[in-house]
């Protein structure tokens, strides 16, 4: 998929070229949703979690060109780490979250060091193998993970000892929103830095970057580890919000969903994860009420249309519409 010019249309969000109002708008909407959502806060929390998960994939795939099918391995690792820590060590959500992020980052560092020496189909198959092995291990290790029944009995203490994680979802939503904002700022600073620009060079031409002395492997390992930590954070948020870890967090289907979300929203856009996750989950929620399988058909059509007509995902919709309207005006003037 070709990369649209980030300086045009909504793509400017990704490179910090929008006004302060433009940057603040998505966050203002998220805050307003907290007050207006009513009984949909739990749904909103899931949207925030998937945004963070998609953002983690965007760092690896979009900005560094690391094509992976195994992002669910880090999401699931973080989810199980947070759940097991809450059961066996401490139910404090912040401490559990930090531990989950740390161990997932370490897992990403180790696996990245092993597989980033490879490229192309070999690398893709290795990421596939990692998530498949983890899924099977979690399925078989019933005493540790609960197997197919999932990890149950995860009790989460009140946040700061004051705010309970209730069924209404207020605490979980605000907690997820703050965590997402912190990670977004980190991601934005990374992609806007000289390090981020070097990743863009590596994505386009790794041989040339090596020729000018760039430590390509080390930089890929660094962004791969950061991507893993971010995905692990999303997994930990999922555990804290639902107090349950299902085996599906390690499934290939989960890796596929996050890839679809990113493609729908727009790769290398940062805010593309926001658009993609919101649209995907809204369509899923709406169409699933009509038929349990109908939503997959709708999402499939959206994905095909996005790939064919919107090179930059739904984030590119405004630019495409302006282009079409411009052509219509020119045709009318003739």
Please place each PLM-identified region on the residue numbering.
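Transmembrane alpha-helices and adjacent helix-loop boundaries
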Residues: 1-334
């Amino acid at each position: 998929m070709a990369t649209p010019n980030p300086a045009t249309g909504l793509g400017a969000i990704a490179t910090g070229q929008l006004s302060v109002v433009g940057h603040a708008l998505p966050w203002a909407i998220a805050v307003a949703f907290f007050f207006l959502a009513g009984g949909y806060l739990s749904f909103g929390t899931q949207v925030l979690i998937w945004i963070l998960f998609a953002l983690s994939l965007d760092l690896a795939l979009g900005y560094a060109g690391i094509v992976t099918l195994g992002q669910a391995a880090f999401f699931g690792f973080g989810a199980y780490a947070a759940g097991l820590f809450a059961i066996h060590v401490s139910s404090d959500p912040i401490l559990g979250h930090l531990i989950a992020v740390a161990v997932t980052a370490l897992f990403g560092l180790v696996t990245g060091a092993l597989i980033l020496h490879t490229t192309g189909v070999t690398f893709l198959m290795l990421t596939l193998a990692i998530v498949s092995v983890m899924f099977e291990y979690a399925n078989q290790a019933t005493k540790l993970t609960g197997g197919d029944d999932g990890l149950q009995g995860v009790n989460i203490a009140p946040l700061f000892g004051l705010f309970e994680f209730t069924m209404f979802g207020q605490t979980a939503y605000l907690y997820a929103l703050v965590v997402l904002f912190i990670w977004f700022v980190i991601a934005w600073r990374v992609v806007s830095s000289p390090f981020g620009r070097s990743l863009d060079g590596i994505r386009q031409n790794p041989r040339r970057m090596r020729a000018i002395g760039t430590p390509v492997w080390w930089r890929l390992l660094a962004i791969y580890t950061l991507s893993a930590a971010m995905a692990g954070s999303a997994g930990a948020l999922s555990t804290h919000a639902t107090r349950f870890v299902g085996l599906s967090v390690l499934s290939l289907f989960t890796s596929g969903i996050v890839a679809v979300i990113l493609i729908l929203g727009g790769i290398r856009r940062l805010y593309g994860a926001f658009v993609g996750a919101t649209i995907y989950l809204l369509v899923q929620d709406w169409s699933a009420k009509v038929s349990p399988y109908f939503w997959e058909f709708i999402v499939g059509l959206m994905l095909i249309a996005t790939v064919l007509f919107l090179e930059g995902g739904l984030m590119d919709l405004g630019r495409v519409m302006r282009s079409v309207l411009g052509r219509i005006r020119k045709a009318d003037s003739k």
